[in-house]
């Protein structure tokens, strides 16, 4: 069994994205940055990451492209997929909520989760259902004639690897 996983990456901009995804695929392993003076034992694993070309992409698109690339690579290395795909550090229902507000239909939102974020169909449906419930609650609040305080406490029945 591996003792440690070291991430060797050619662009530190994506280090945080990389460490979170690697930890998601290897939840019981310690993950650290590979440095020039790192001593690697035969039980350790080094994941060498070359960041793909990001020409013409904005910051958000670059991070999505990198996470998609690394997710595919880690999935291939481990033979595993993650229920929420590469989504980490974000409430999936927020993505669905914004898309519903923008008038997108449920099928389009589900395809977005599955194709872009690599989430399972089951989790995509869950995000949509939670977003619809949030929307129903928030639509009942009278913003004009009083004060409202909304505390975003997740009521999602699943526990994400990063939650």
Language-model segments: what does each one mean?
Residues 90-97, 133-163:
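N-terminal pre-triad scaffold of radical SAM enzymes
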Residues 1-83:
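A short, structured N-terminal alpha-helical element that caps or precedes a catalytic domain
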Residues 74-81, 101-149:
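N-terminal [4Fe-4S]-dependent radical SAM core
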């Amino acid at each position: 069994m591996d003792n440690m996983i070291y991430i060797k990456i050619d662009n530190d901009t994506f280090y945080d994205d990389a460490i979170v995804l690697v930890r998601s695929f290897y939840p019981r392993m310690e993950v650290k940055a590979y440095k020039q003076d790192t001593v690697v034992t035969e039980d350790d694993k080094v994941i060498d990451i070359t960041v793909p070309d990001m020409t013409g992409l904005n910051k958000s698109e670059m991070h999505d492209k990198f996470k998609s690339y690394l997710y595919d690579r880690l999935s291939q290395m481990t033979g595993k997929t993650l229920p929420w795909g590469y989504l980490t550090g974000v409430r999936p229902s927020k993505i669905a909520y914004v898309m519903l507000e923008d008038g997108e239909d449920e099928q389009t939102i589900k395809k977005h989760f599955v194709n872009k974020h690599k989430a399972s169909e089951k989790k995509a449906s869950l995000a949509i259902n939670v977003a619809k419930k949030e929307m129903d609650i928030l639509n009942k609040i009278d913003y004009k004639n009083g004060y409202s305080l909304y505390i975003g406490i997740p009521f999602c029945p699943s526990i994400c690897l990063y939650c």
